[in-house]
Every structure is written in structure tokens, then in C-alpha cells.
From Swiss-Prot:
GO terms for biological process: ribosomal large subunit assembly; translation. The gene is rplT. It comes from the Bacteria. InterPro entries: Ribosomal_bL20, RIBOSOMAL_L20_CS, Ribosomal_protein_bL20_C. Keywords: Ribonucleoprotein, Ribosomal protein, RNA-binding, rRNA-binding. Binds directly to 23S ribosomal RNA and is necessary for the in vitro assembly process of the 50S ribosomal subunit. It is not involved in the protein synthesizing functions of that subunit. This is Large ribosomal subunit protein bL20. The keyword Ribosomal protein applies. It comes from Prochlorococcus marinus (strain NATL2A). One of its GO terms (cellular component) is ribonucleoprotein complex.
Length: 115
């Protein structure tokens, strides 16, 4: 059986991991074995949190809309139900921005959803 010479393959693989680990503290950024563990964990966290971010922002928007709706005498569910009945199609992100940036406009939307 012929001898297999790997050349630069192993070094390239290790350097790729160390490049990804740049900026990590201590040996986590310089030693291959610990850097490899940290990089794998970091990539797992990034994958998980890309999905979690969508949930977190939706919760934040709902909390903001609820607070602004209660200032106008409505609960969140009544407010959203009123928007559906009035056929006002504004998504939660835009409603939350209105509540924070332009409360007068949000009040107008709330009045329309009441009627």
C-alpha cells in the first residue's frame, strides 16, 4: 500500500479553527484543542440564537404594543382583534415602533381599532 502524504491539509484545518477562535480569551484562542471546543460551542450558540432572536423580538414587540394599548384603554388581545376587524394590516414590528416613536399615531390606530 502506498504512503499517503497529507501535505498542508492538517495545518490548514487547524489554522481555519484558530482563525475562527481569534479574540477568544486565553488558551481558547491559541491552543487548537480548546479553541476547537470553543468554536464548536460558539457555532452551536449562534445557530440556536438566530432562531431565538426571532422569538425574543416578537415578545418585545408584543410587550410594547400591550403597554401602549393599555394607555389607550385596551388590552393587547382586544387591540389586535379590533385591528383585524377594522382590516388594518400593520405588523407587530411597525406597531411597536409607532408606540415608541410616534404615540399620537398609535393613539389614532387604537381609536380606529376600538370602533
Amino acid at each position: 500500500m502506498a504512503r499517503v502524504k497529507r501535505g498542508n491539509v492538517a495545518r490548514k484545518r487547524r489554522n481555519k479553527i484558530l482563525r475562527l477562535a481569534r479574540g477568544f480569551r486565553g488558551g481558547n484562542g491559541t491552543l487548537f484543542r480548546t479553541a476547537n471546543q470553543r468554536v464548536m460551542k460558539a457555532l452551536c450558540n449562534a445557530y440556536r440564537d438566530r432562531r431565538r432572536r426571532k422569538r425574543d423580538f416578537r415578545r418585545l414587540w408584543i410587550a410594547r404594543i400591550n403597554a401602549a394599548a393599555r394607555l389607550n384603554g385596551l388590552s393587547y388581545s382586544k387591540f389586535m382583534g379590533g385591528l383585524k376587524k377594522a382590516d388594518i394590516r400593520i405588523n407587530r414590528k411597525m406597531l411597536a415602533q409607532l408606540a415608541v416613536i410616534d404615540p399620537k399615531t398609535f393613539t389614532n390606530v387604537a381609536v380606529n381599532s376600538k370602533s
